[in-house]
């Protein structure tokens, strides 16, 4: 690490897996990575072909949007345009198990959202995920299961069809299994109730 780098060192096998995942993403492939909620399926979120590959692996309808994961909030604002209130919310809850819906810039392709100008932003509270995002991000943030099937909490649960379709799998410990809460701060609407939802509701009420 560079002097002043605040990243936590990873054990050697995990670092090797992370390096393979970065190489795979840069080659246009998808990878499986751990987060604080469930295992995610990540690919270069700025590359329409890579995004399309994620949809294919998950067998996900193209009209269902994908969220995007970033290494930190400043990185996220390079690709999105949050309002002051949305940014205040992000600084309160990110990194964390929350997906915040904000306006996207054109550097994020329409395929991610089926043309919707708004997109979900994640900054995972997981060191492996953060290092992956910083090295290869922004990357897609969607669960590493096929659509309609249970989320993946540990590597042993990963469907073989997904494992065979990705360029790398970063195997780590079992995750919490609770999905992120999806919130549109501009309207105060919670689209999916998940982790930290009570604190989010309190923030929305207090800042209304």
Question: What residue spans do the PLM features occupy?
Answer:
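Active-site-adjacent structural elements in enzyme catalytic cores
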Residues: 1-208
């Amino acid at each position: 690490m560079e002097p002043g780098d605040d990243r936590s060192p990873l054990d050697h096998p995990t670092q090797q897996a992370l390096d393979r995942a970065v190489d795979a993403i840069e080659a246009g492939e998808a990878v499986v990575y751990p987060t604080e909620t469930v295992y995610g399926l990540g690919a270069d979120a700025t590359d329409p072909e890579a995004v399309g590959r994620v949809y294919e692996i998950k067998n996900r309808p193209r009209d269902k949007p994908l969220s995007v994961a970033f290494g930190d909030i400043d990185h996220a604002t390079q690709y999105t345009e949050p309002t002051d209130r949305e940014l205040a919310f992000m600084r309160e809850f990110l990194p964390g198990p929350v997906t915040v819906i904000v306006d996207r810039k054109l550097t994020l392709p329409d395929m991610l959202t089926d043309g919707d100008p708004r997109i979900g932003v994640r900054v995972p509270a997981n060191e492996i995920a953060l290092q992956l995002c910083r090295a290869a991000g922004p990357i897609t943030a969607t669960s590493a299961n096929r659509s309609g099937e249970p989320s993946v909490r540990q590597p042993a649960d990963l469907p073989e069809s997904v494992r065979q379709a990705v360029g790398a799998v970063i195997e780590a410990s079992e995750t919490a299994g609770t999905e992120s809460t999806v919130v549109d701060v501009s309207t105060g609407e919670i689209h999916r109730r998940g982790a930290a939802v009570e604190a989010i509701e309190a923030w929305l009420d207090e800042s209304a």
